[in-house]
UniProtKB/Swiss-Prot annotation:
GO process terms (BP): protein maturation; protein modification process
Stated family: Belongs to the HypA/HybF family.
Residues forming coiled coils: none
Keywords, sorted A to Z: Metal-binding, Nickel, Zinc
Its job: Involved in the maturation of [NiFe] hydrogenases. Required for nickel insertion into the metal center of the hydrogenase.
Keyword Metal-binding attributed: yes
Protein name: Hydrogenase maturation factor HypA
Organism this protein belongs to: Caldanaerobacter subterraneus subsp. tengcongensis (strain DSM 15242 / JCM 11007 / NBRC 100824 / MB4) (Thermoanaerobacter tengcongensis)
């Protein structure tokens, strides 16, 4: 359910930026979502369509880029993406892993306007 508040923030930001720049129409928004955020793109799309009604972003295409999480083995230092729902290091078999650099992203990558 947190997708509603996340999407409301996204729409508020779009409308605010559009007003600042005197944009008449937002046509496309690209959003990056890390797989560890727990944010479901389908829910964001659902709320986006509702929340943008009667705004400059109404009818805008919403595109998602999903970023796979990256983990670092605490035993050998190998950086890897999780596969088959296991967090075992594919190099040494170690099970102690830390979240590395990717997977927690949530941001607007680009906005296309008329």
């Amino acid at each position: 359910m947190h997708e509603l508040s996340v999407t409301q923030g996204l729409v508020d930001m779009l409308v605010e930026e559009a007003e600042k720049r005197k944009v008449k129409k937002v046509t496309k928004v690209t959003v990056v979502i890390g797989e560890l955020t727990g944010i479901e793109s389908e829910s964001v799309k659902f709320y986006f369509d509702i929340l943008t009604e009667n705004t400059v972003a109404e009818g805008a295409e919403l595109v998602f880029k999903i970023v796979r999480a990256q983990f670092k083995c605490t035993q050998c230092g190998n950086v890897f993406e999780r596969s088959n729902f296991t967090f075992k290091c594919p190099v040494c078999g170690g099970q102690g892993v830390l979240i590395d650099k990717r997977g927690k992203e949530f941001y607007i990558e680009s906005i296309e306007v008329e």
